[in-house]
Every structure is written in structure tokens, then in C-alpha cells.
Amino acid sequence: MTFSAAAFNQWDEFGKQVVKDHLLTKGHIIVPNPDRYGVDLYSDKNGKLYRWEVEVKSTTKWTSQEDYPYDTVSFLGRKEKWKAFPFWYCFVCTETKKILSAYSEQIYQEEYEVRKYIQGRGEVQKFYHVPKHLCYWS
């Protein structure tokens, strides 16, 4: 799938707001993000800094692990560049506003690596297919 500026503009703030709202209910404080080109969000809870990458899924509907239609969750390999400073990688369902997430240290493991040819990009890209039971659902 190629990058769509229209889809980004439509869903980026929506996804980040859903995650922010969820974090606030869990006692996090949203803090300014110092890196415009890094992960999407930073939060603090009890003096510990957390980092959050947020993507929105508009073509897959789920409310929980049980009704998620696949056995694995596919995470983009190009986000691996941020793994030196661990982060939570989140997907937000546009229809249900449910969040699924996994920690970067869990995602970026050789056993989950898959390479696929992406027609719209004309290249092979790396993905990580993490078993859905290893993800967090909220």
C-alpha cells in the first residue's frame, strides 16, 4: 500500500486522539513530542516516559482479539528504526475506536519477519507478523 496524504490527513489526528484519550484514563500525562519525524506521542506515568506510534485501520474491524480476523498482526518494518528507544506500536480501528498494540521489543524479532513485494511501491518491504495473542487489546 502506498502512502496516501488524503488518508493521513483524514485519520492521523483521529488515531492519536483515541490513543491519548485511552492513556489519560490509565493515568498517563501526555507530554510534548520533541521529534516531529519520530514516533507520534509521548506520555509520562509515575515519572516513566512512554513512546507511542499510532496507525489507523479503516479496512479491518475488530473489538477484541476474539473477533480480529487474522491470526497475526502485521507491523511495518520501516518503524524498526526507532527500536533503540522502545515504543508501543498501536493500531486504532476507525469503526470501533478499539486499540491493539504491541511493544517494539516484542515485535521486531527475526522469527516474525516477513518480506513482501508491495505493488504500489514497486519494492520488497519488511513486515513483522506477530501472533495476535501477544498483542494488547483495549
Model-derived segments and their meaning:
Residues M1-Q17, D21:
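Interdomain/boundary linker segments immediately adjacent to catalytic/signaling cores
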Residues F3-N9, K26, V31-P32, L49, ...:
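Catalytic cores of nucleic-acid endonucleases
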Residues F14, V18, R36, A84:
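Short, well-structured alpha-helical interface segments that form or flank functional binding sites
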Residues V19, Y42, K81, V124-K126:
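Intrinsically disordered, low-complexity, compositionally biased regions/tails
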Residues D21, T25-K26, Y42-E53:
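Active-site beta-strand-loop-beta-strand hairpin of nuclease catalytic cores
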Residues T25, D44-N46, T94-S138:
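Non-catalytic C-terminal interaction segments of nucleic acid-processing enzymes
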Residues I29-K45:
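Charged, well-structured alpha/beta interaction segments
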